[in-house]
Amino acid sequence: MKYRLVITLLMFMFVGSVGNAQTFRDNNNMQLGIVESDGTVRNANNMRLGKIFEDGTIRDSNNMRLGTIEKDGTIRDKNNMRLGTVSSDGVVRDNNNMRLGTISSDGTIRNNNNMRIGTASGVNAKYAAVLFFFNLF
């Protein structure tokens, strides 16, 4: 009986840990990777690509700084050059204020031509912009 209980608890722990990760997928619904609750970004093969820290710092798997996400939605590269912004309504713009696309509240990612290019289910819109539009990973 104890053995079954332990196995059941382990199963729930595993399901719970996977459930905390948010997925991002391409237009064909193929999983590109996940963003874990602590900001760790992994590809579809579960290889660690890097991490987005609470202060907005983006680092690769070797802990090299790739850029930052500022509180106002400004995305900067490792040299502190402004790459673009993500507004509170999900509109993504480049450094020249040209519209790149949108990230809707349901996680749908659309390019400037309103074509669906992927999804980021449960992923913070700023993180999704880094992953889909600014290619910092």
Tell me what each language-model feature is.
Residues 2-32, 36-49, 54-59, 64-66, ...:
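Long terminal segments
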